[in-house]
From Swiss-Prot:
Taxonomic source organism: Eremothecium gossypii (strain ATCC 10895 / CBS 109.51 / FGSC 9923 / NRRL Y-1056)
GO (cellular component) term, any one: cytoplasm
Alphabetical list of PROSITE patterns matching this protein: PROTEIN_KINASE_ATP (PS00107), PROTEIN_KINASE_DOM (PS50011), PROTEIN_KINASE_ST (PS00108)
UniProt subcellular location: Nucleus; Cytoplasm, Cytoskeleton, Spindle; Chromosome, Centromere, Kinetochore
Entry annotated with the keyword Nucleus: yes
Pfam families for this protein: Pkinase
ATP-binding keyword on record: yes
Enzyme Commission no: 2.7.11.1
Residue span, Protein kinase domain: 109-360
One annotated GO biological process: chromosome segregation
Catalytic residues (positions): D232
Protein name in the entry: Aurora kinase
Enzyme class at the top of the EC tree: transferase
Family: Belongs to the protein kinase superfamily. Ser/Thr protein kinase family. Aurora subfamily.
């Protein structure tokens, strides 16, 4: 049975069987994350973060008639933590030896519900039939990877994510492929996107928000020490696990930047762009620090600080650094946000200082 038939067959399961499957998945799972690609979110009448407001260097290229898509998966060498763990014999996932996950194919998995849909594929909750190991499986069409000219970006995403080991970064276990698709195996988190939780309560209190900001600062500090920029921080790309642990996901725009060098590519989400990105100037890891400031504001207020009806108006507010705080925002939280959102990248607060900021310290005992 080919991959298409397997996916279609599993998606025709009854809702009762789906619920039973997902229940058993939760009982078997000890650590989790979903890695689902972010969904564009829309506010009535505002077109909030609609696809038109998401920037990326992707170009929609037409393929030559009769040209057969070929994706050199073999170029992804030594990037699978599964293979590395198998060699050392030390790593395990959810109590299951990772050697169980060698030489995989789609038929080795039970396919659960769709966790997310993106431009280049879908993410499913799956269970490895033999071991019972539960994870998220991202299925991407090879023809789409080639058509949209993202082979380099795809390889970079896999190589970067597979090299990261941090409690607040989603882990990529490995990948496999067949004739039509590439499949990425990632952690599964049962609690879903941070944005969905934020939307359900309008904003978080200081205790919860400070804990999330601390974790993100630690994760970004870890990445920056390894010369890696994320470049797409936002609530849709953060997943919640057990005990309010959060994990940054979606490394599609991440890039390795040697110490002292800068980037020029414009990418990210409009509301989270820093002034230097908007002005098309060279930038470094401080764009992530700015984005953390926007995230902190959004966690406490419920919307980004510079949000406007159009991209152009949002740009103007960002460049003017027109920062307005509602009355309920704590004074020390305002100070931290202002330090993160300094116009000059060199003036932005270092991430190590973020973790020791008075707003963080006074809320830490209540985590």
């Amino acid at each position: 049975m080919d991959a298409d038939a397997i996916l279609k067959k599993d998606q025709r399961r009854s809702s009762l069987k789906q619920r039973n499957l997902l229940l058993s998945m939760r009982l078997n799972q000890t650590t989790a994350t979903n890695g689902a690609p972010p969904q564009a979110r829309v506010q009535p009448g505002k077109g909030y973060r609609n696809p038109g407001k998401v920037l990326s260097p992707i170009r929609n290229q037409e393929m030559s008639p009769g040209k057969r898509p070929t994706l050199e998966i073999s170029e992804l060498k030594n990037v699978s933590p599964i293979n590395q763990a198998h060699k050392t014999g030390k790593a395990r996932a959810g109590g299951v030896p990772l050697s169980k996950l060698q030489n995989l194919k789609l038929a080795d998995f039970e396919i659960g519900k769709v966790l997310g849909k993106g431009k280049f594929g879908r993410v499913y909750c799956v269970r490895h039939i033999e071991s019972g190991f539960v994870c998220a499986l991202k299925a991407m069409e090879k023809k789409d990877i080639i058509q949209y000219n993202i082979e380099k970006q795809f390889r970079r995403e896999v190589e970067i994510q597979s090299s990261l080991r941090h409690p607040n970064l989603t882990q990529l276990y490995g990948y496999f492929h067949d004739e039509k698709r590439v499949y990425l195996l990632m952690e599964y988190l049962v609690n879903g996107e941070l944005y969905k939780h934020l939307k359900g309560r309008s904003h978080f209190n200081d205790v919860v928000a400070s804990y999330y900001v601390y974790q993100m600062a630690d994760a970004l500090d870890y990445m920056h020490e390894r010369n890696i920029l994320h470049r797409d921080i936002k609530p849709e790309n953060i997943i919640i696990g057990f005990n309010n642990t959060i994990k940054l996901t979606d490394f599609g725009w991440s890039v390795i930047t040697p110490k002292g060098s800068k980037r020029k590519t414009l990418c990210g989400t409009v509301d989270y762009l820093s002034p230097e990105l908007i002005r098309s100037r060279e930038y470094n890891e401080k764009v992530d620090v700015w984005a953390l400031g926007v995230l902190t504001y959004e966690l406490l207020v419920g919307s980004p600080p510079f949000e406007e009806e159009s991209k152009e108006l949002t740009y103007k507010r960002i460049l003017k650094r027109n920062l307005i705080f509602p009355d309920h925002v704590d004074t020390e939280a305002r100070h931290l946000i202002s330090r993160l959102l300094e116009y000059d990248p060199g003036d932005r607060i270092p991430l190590k200082e973020v973790k020791k900021h008075p707003w963080i310290e006074k809320n830490k005992p209540f985590w």
